[in-house]
Amino acid sequence: MARQKIDYGIDLGTTNSAIARLENGEIKIIKSNDGQMDTTPSVVHINRAKTNFIGLKAFNQIDADAKKALKEFQNKGIDSGSNTFFEFKRTMGTDKKYLCPNIGKEFLSEELSAEVLKKLKSYVLDETIQSAVITVPAKFRQNQLNATQKAAELAGFVYCELLQEPIAASIAYGLDVQNMKGFWLVFDFGGGTFDAALMKVDDGIMKVVDTEGDNNLGGKNIDYAIVDHLFIPELKQKFQLNNVMKNDLGQHLLRDVLKKYAEEAKIELSLNESASPYADDLGFDDGGNELILEMEIGIEQYEKVISPIFQRAIDISLKLLERNNLQGSFLETILLVGGPTFSQTLRRMLKLQICSNIETSIDPMTAVAKGAALFAATKDIPPNQQKRDTAKVQLTLKYPETTVETEEKLGLLVNRNYSSKSVSGKIFAEILRNDNAWSSGKIEIVDDAEIFSLLLNPSKSNCFTITLFDEKGNMLPCEPSEFTVIQGLKVANATLPYNIGIDLFDPSMGKIGVYTLKGLEKNTSLPAKGKGIFKTQKDIRPGNRNDQLKIEIYECGYKEDGSKKILNELINLVIISGEELPQFLPANSDIEIVLEIDTSRRITFSAYFPYLDETVDLEVPEQRQAEFNADELNTEIIRAKESLFNLETDAILVDYSEIAKMESELSEIAILLENGKGDYNTKTQVMERLREIFKRIDQINEENEWPTIEDELNWLLERMKNNNQRYGNDKTKKQAEQFELQAKEVSRQMNIKIAKELMEQIRSFNFTLVRDDIGFWINYIRDFDNNFSTHEWTSTSRARTLLDDAKQIISTNPSKMKIEEIVRELFTLIPEKEKAAISENDDSTLMR
């Protein structure tokens, strides 16, 4: 029977992957064809004969390939590369390329991921899979999601939906739990990523409340911590390693060789009190002695090294709970997902710091794939991609795929016109639950439409078979002939893990920042639509490609409106030029931006120009993350340390314990960078963590800006009072009193942004009051004259002539009108770049 539902769920993991499907109401993990394992190593190896090996056979090549590369470096000082690739999920959506020397070809991460997907597809022998639900970390960035979709396309999937991994795990867990209620935490610590998801069940409906995570935190970090803090110090103590360790490539290759043995020790110490790693055939040291790693690691020694990594994941989880006004004691349970969660160390830390009730009844290695398959069983394959057998009677079914009720309705419609085989006369149908414990009985389908009552087994996937009969009792083949209703759980839609915003110039703040689009706030249910009306800053001439509006789309953090662009993740840059517009668009025109995001977080963009009554629909171009430079990252670490020092010495409103904590984290980041400067993922992780520190530094600086802002606001109010007494009237007096009331409220809130907006209004009001006073304009002339050389006039001679004329008028026959005209013309002679520098603005950016 051709499938109408997707049915297949795939966990495309950093370290291991798995595939599952729903069969007769039960979730089945489809085992590998090389060892009958539930999971498949996410590893690709290509030999000299250009044959691809994926999974276990490829995994077995990692050690030999790494040792060969290290020896080539030791003997010849060259990088011979590797023909075995793993953990490439961490570089999805980046410009990272993996060179395969055996075939002289480079691969992007999505191309390697596609090979893993093809391998998983090959396990299914009874049909060809064309659709699947593929899971992704909740905190995956847009470029990573795009790369995952691309991998599915390269693997031959015609249709693919993406599902967040914590949701998939929750579905697998939730179906086995009776009377679910309250909050629980999904703690998904995988091989390469970490997600914390706060879930809640209300009346059987499960939804994501909030998420947090780190796309560069996982089992790989533990492996390298063991290498850097246990293995390499041990080798340095016994051998001379200067030649290898002083070279970035040599250090990188040695770490890669030792990683396998670190992983083995990690697994052993998950359950035992000690481990005895042994590795030989590592080449030679500087003195020609054979390198051999042989040591004993006790649990205390191990925990000292890896606890900070687990602690970071726990801190992220605690931050998530605090943000939602919850404590660990409020949780029903913690659901563990991912191989590293087998660790006795981690489980003990979780019980002590978050919640003692840890759920271990489901397999952390397969929970995501099983949940994805359950989810896939509720999702339709698009009708234009379904393969229908029109020789069978075609049916349309309407029913709830998931429910918390034990009785539901099925709507059944017979589509006689869609069947190539003629069907006449009455048609009867019987609906049979697959456990044979319930049947609808044979019921006539009157006027080709009927509603059936269904009785469901609780907390199970209920699979039903449809059988059609003609008036004589002959069976009529039909399609679809099966459907499934999952009882006991109803899953709300996935949510946005980030705010989605665009860069805008804020005239009140005098700078460009990233602002969230209304409707695309973090934790908004998908699909979602965000829109906002903004202003253009310059003229756009039709047909002119150089006249451009640039809209940068960003993923940004929680409550971070107005933050610097560099501190947010750029998704895409959309450019609208004069080539897209049919008529002239003047500056200060309205533009309505609309972003729509579907359940797989695919984005569509449109811009409406009311002045032209024109809508521009554009594809959101793909954006790849570039590799970060280790030296530049080190410079940023130094800059962050200097900023913290300045806060300690200069800031008035500062929590010194928080400063100390950030200083400690910077030291940790510096060590991380030093040990992994040759590793792509390590540098990405360093940049992500630096961003968080710089965001907090900016917030503290803004908080400390208030005393200065308050002084300036009070000065403006005093000036306004004086000007109003001298030039005002009853009407302006009321306006001034209103400003004073607003200023009191702003001061009470200590709101810097609103204060700056109010100050701009007061300045404008002051200008209105004094503009009729000739002394006001004379002061401008004197200021321009005294600071003439500091301005880069567009015409120095014209500016000089105007000032000389003004001084002549002032000394002989003062005229307010003439002086004002000269001042306004002088302002036009100030160059645009000088104005832009003053306001930190780019006129191709939209304005709030």
Located regions from the model:
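Glycine-rich phosphate-binding loop of actin/hexokinase-like ATP-binding domains
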Residues: 29-37, 176-232, 432-450, 462, ...
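Gly/Thr-rich phosphate-binding beta-strand-loop-beta motif of the actin/hexokinase/Hsp70
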Residues: 2-27, 177-209, 336, 422-424, ...
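Acidic low-complexity intrinsically disordered segments
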Residues: 4, 158, 290-299, 303, ...
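Conserved phosphate-binding/catalytic loops in two-lobed NTP-binding clefts
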Residues: 156-164, 168, 347-373, 377
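Phosphate/ATP-binding catalytic cores across multiple sugar-kinase/actin-like superfamilies
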Residues: 3, 115-127, 166-178, 304-334, ...
